[in-house]
Amino acid sequence: MVTTPSFKPTYEQNTFKLSPTATTTTLPWNNTSLPTTPLFGTDGIRGKAGELLTAPMALQIGFWAGQVLPQYCQNPGPIIMGQDTRNSGNMLAMALSAGLTAAGLEVWNLGLCPTPCVAYITSISEAIGGVMISASHNPPEDNGIKFFGSDGTKLSSELQQKIESGIRGTANFPTNHSNWGQHYHRPELVKEYQASLHSPLTPGSLQGMKIVLDLAWGAAVHTAPEVFRGMGAEIICLHDQPNGDRINVNCGSTHLSHLQQAVIEHNANLGFAFDGDADRVLAIDSQGRSIDGDYILYFWGQSLSKARLLPNNLIVTTVMANLGFEHAWNKQGGKILRTKVGDQYVHAEMQRTGSMLGGEQSGHVLCPHYGITGDGLMTALHLATLVKNSGISLAELVDQSFKTYPQLLRNVRVEDRDRRANWKNCEPLVKTIEEAETALADLGRVLVRASGTEPVIRVMVEAINLELAKSWTENIVLAVQQHLLPTKD
């Protein structure tokens, strides 16, 4: 059990106290320009630091989260805070903490740590909730604020909407202005998270393995090396210093080329690439091939099934999962359920069905046997252990598994939030998509969606051959560019 610290706060109490009669229109920071589209996307609030995510906005977010959480959570404890390495992180952390403490909450700031660390510490500390300041795999100029409930899972859409109603001045619930909280630095709690990753595994189980880690200049730069060395692995680290200017830039889980080269050059057994907040991971085999979340789910599913730890051989994944994975799993007597893109949808379906394994092709993997949320470090440790115990290489496991259908994914940047949100009202684009679906029929799939984390429209085409996938991807991307982007004079 994590206990309240006995030492004094690291800085003084707030020097102001809100009037008990204050309203949203009289709050001193209530002058932030808000978009017409919802603030909360599939992974919290994200945007460019200094534009959408300013200090006044973070203050409001913190204050209204501090009003909402106590009304729906019985835990009397603190809110757990963490952040990645982005340059805007400290600014947002201080403003967010000011809002939370102004609302009467106590803040425990873990400092630099992976997102799953915040979720874990929240779940074991009787916390009222958690909050992570990160934009995950997004570029350095972006940032984000993501809340967790007291159980360490992502905050429900209902509570996110209540927080947003306060920010927008439409809240219809009572507010507390009579107390203020304290702020504590608690970086030592990160060690408890690291211990939780080791506890289900045999000490030294990775001895004899050489593993390359690409840490993306992000949240796992300190945690990941300690965790893997603690299991006996020999590790080579890439992009392993905190660097807010370079987080995710040409590295990590969205840019695998450096890791692929390093695995081959060092004759390593395998490699792992994390994103900026380390809640997802992709692997590289000894031949330099990328191993995505579909393969990770397949291998882990086989292992859990053999141990009788996978009820009904059910795996929950998203609409992005490759048909080759689904067909191979079905042939083994398994079952695949698909959800919308977003690990919160995967988690909800897992809860509904009692599934013990789920995840996304992008590398978010959830296994309730070992963790409460998607965790890149947990996934990497278990995959490495699985490979070691198999007696063969990851490359051999891949060769014995399944062939993927060619799948192309293109991201088209659309800055206009309204156009992104309402793309389905664009008749020429919808017509092009329908033509593609008719042409592909049973030979492939089309998926077009607005990203919930980046200002892009994602176009995915999967087909029985690469030429077919390329042709329809190009047609749909062209339609997006012609009809959703502003015309040039």
Curated annotation (Swiss-Prot):
Protein name listed in UniProt: Phosphoglucosamine mutase
Cellular component terms (Gene Ontology): cytosol
Residue numbers bearing the Phosphoserine modification: 136
Entry annotated with the keyword Metal-binding: yes
Residues involved in Mg(2+) binding: 136, 275, 277, 279
Cofactors required: Mg(2+)
Function statement: Catalyzes the conversion of glucosamine-6-phosphate to glucosamine-1-phosphate.
Tagged with keyword Metal-binding: yes
One MF term in the entry's GO annotations: phosphoglucosamine mutase activity
Cofactor note: Binds 1 Mg(2+) ion per subunit.
A family per Pfam: PGM_PMM_II
HAMAP family reported for this sequence: GlmM_B
Any one GO BP annotation for this protein: UDP-N-acetylglucosamine biosynthetic process
Family to which the UniProt record says this protein belongs: Belongs to the phosphohexose mutase family.
Keywords: Isomerase, Magnesium, Metal-binding, Phosphoprotein
Gene: glmM
Highest taxon in the source lineage: Bacteria
